[in-house]
UniProtKB/Swiss-Prot annotation:
SMART domains linked: CNX (SM00037), Connexin_CCC (SM01089)
Compositionally biased intervals (Basic and acidic residues): 353-365, 375-405
Extracellular-side segments: 43-71, 183-210
A GO cellular component annotation in the UniProt record: connexin complex
Disulfide bonds: C54-C201, C61-C195, C65-C190
Organism field: Ovis aries
A Pfam family recorded for this sequence: Connexin50
Membrane topology of the entry: Multi-pass membrane protein
Intramembrane stretches: 2-12
Designated name of the protein: Gap junction alpha-8 protein
Sequence ranges on the Cytoplasmic membrane side: 13-21, 93-161, 232-440
Subunit relationships: A hemichannel or connexon is composed of a hexamer of connexins. A functional gap junction is formed by the apposition of two hemichannels. Forms heteromeric channels with GJA3.
Compositionally biased intervals (Low complexity): 423-432
């Protein structure tokens, strides 16, 4: 037979661009078809027509009977089968090589565009060129280790070539059955013209030829099974990837990026605008003032336990004493109201807490004397009272009293027996009057 090296070199390219099952199919094709067909089958069918003998002397009858028994030689049929089955693989290899060349050209074009966009970076061009050269060298020198992914149009072409291989395998198996059947009989009877009657013809090596036919049909069946298995493998792989894509895509394709906070100083501030920042919550402590304190001085923040100690309940005797010291009598309240009507309260004249307690005690001791003073005021001469008032009242109070002279007679008309002056003044006036009586 002829040289099969050319077809073998082409089919080696298919091995690089096919799946595992496709490589097994190529192994079956090379070893069990081409190798056996080239070594053993030629010797078995070498004397096919010369050994076909018929029991007639009619010229042409033997040739006509051989043509009817074997319309095409088995060897030539199997060669055609190998060629037709390998043709889709050759088409696929051509498309794969074209795809690889286009990818290489696209990468070279992108590299040139990158080099043109950065003309100043001369130092960076050298390692890029070295990497590209290494990639080209590895793809050209180490062909066996090169990985190729089946996707897109390349995958569709691969599936189509498997379908055509399957169709050709089925077609040749069916054709072989209709032409020869699956066995060769040693006796063949022929009645074609120009044979005078039914002629008996005898086939050489029928058992050996039957074994070869069965072997080749079994190899064709294995190739057909591998094609179907490869189709199912690709289909299941595609379905599995379609089911896994919506689950794995968001986890794998989301890039991990550090999110900048609002208050980062690296953000450029626009003119007239300020970055939004959260205000820090400042805790203020407002301590409770102690009982009896008029003004609470600002205190620094202290632990809560100290405030609990200050605010904690004390003995009942202390509280009653504090209330006695701070609560004024009815007479003091009336005196304060009279002073508020006559003049505003002066801040500088407010007594301290200790003076208030002393004055409250003094007022309580002198409460009895005020009743006697009120009775003696009717007998005392008015000049003494006026002098005492002039000595005690400052000029500001005198001017304010002169501005409101109408209030005194009205109050006297309503309450003729009572005096509206404060008790402190009355006590001082009474003591002054008593001293004057003694001197007189």
């Amino acid at each position: 037979m002829g040289d099969w090296s050319f077809l073998g070199n082409i089919l080696e390219e298919v091995n690089e661009h096919s799946t595992v099952i496709g490589r097994v199919w190529l192994t079956v094709l090379f070893i069990f078809r081409i190798l056996i067909l080239g070594t053993a089958a030629e010797f078995v069918w070498g004397d096919e027509q010369s050994d076909f003998v018929c029991n007639t002397q009619q010229p042409g009858c033997e040739n006509v009977c051989y043509d009817e028994a074997f319309p095409i030689s088995h060897i030539r049929l199997w060669v055609l089968q190998i060629i037709f089955v390998s043709t889709p693989s050759l088409v696929y290899v051509g498309h794969a090589v074209h795809h690889v060349r286009m990818e290489e050209k696209r990468k070279e074009r992108e590299a040139e565009e990158l080099s043109q966009q950065s003309p100043g970076n001369g130092g960076e061009r050298a390692p890029l060129a070295a990497d590209q050269g290494s990639v080209k060298k590895s793809s050209s020198s180490s062909k066996g280790t090169k990985k190729f992914r089946l996707e897109g149009t390349l995958l569709r072409t691969y599936v189509c070539h498997i379908i055509f291989k399957t169709l050709f395998e089925v077609g040749f198996i069916v054709g072989h059955y209709f032409l020869y059947g699956f066995r060769i009989l040693p006796l063949y009877r022929c009645s074609r013209w120009p044979c005078p009657n039914v002629v008996d013809c005898f086939v050489s090596r029928p058992t050996e030829k039957t074994i070869f036919i069965l072997f080749m049909l079994s190899v064709a069946s294995v190739s057909l099974f591998l094609n179907i298995l490869e189709m199912s493998h690709l289909g299941l792989k595609k379905i599995r990837s379609a089911f896994k894509r919506p689950v794995e895509q968001p986890l794998g394709e989301i890039p991990e990026k550090s999110l900048h906070s609002i208050a980062v100083s690296s953000i450029q501030k626009a003119k007239g605008y300020q970055l939004l920042e959260e205000e820090k919550i400042v805790s203020h402590y407002f301590p409770l003032t102690e009982v009896g304190m008029v003004e609470a001085s600002p205190l620094s923040a202290k632990p809560f336990s100290q405030f609990e100690e200050k605010v904690g309940p004390g003995p009942l005797g202390d509280l009653s004493r504090a209330y006695q010291e701070t609560l004024p009598s009815y007479a003091q309240v009336g005196a304060q109201e009279g002073v508020e009507e006559e003049q505003p309260i002066e801040a500088a004249a407010e007594p301290e807490v200790g003076d208030k307690s002393q004055e409250a005690e003094r007022v309580s001791t002198e409460g009895e004397e005020t009743l006697a003073v009120l009775e003696e005021e009717k007998v005392e001469p008015p000049e003494v009272e006026k002098e005492a008032e002039k000595e005690e009242t400052p000029p500001e109070k005198v001017s304010k009293q002169e501005l409101t002279p109408e209030k005194a007679p009205s109050l006297c008309a309503e309450l003729p027996g009572e005096d509206t002056r404060p008790l402190s003044r009355l006590s001082k006036a009474s003591s002054r009057a008593r001293s004057d009586d003694l001197t007189v």
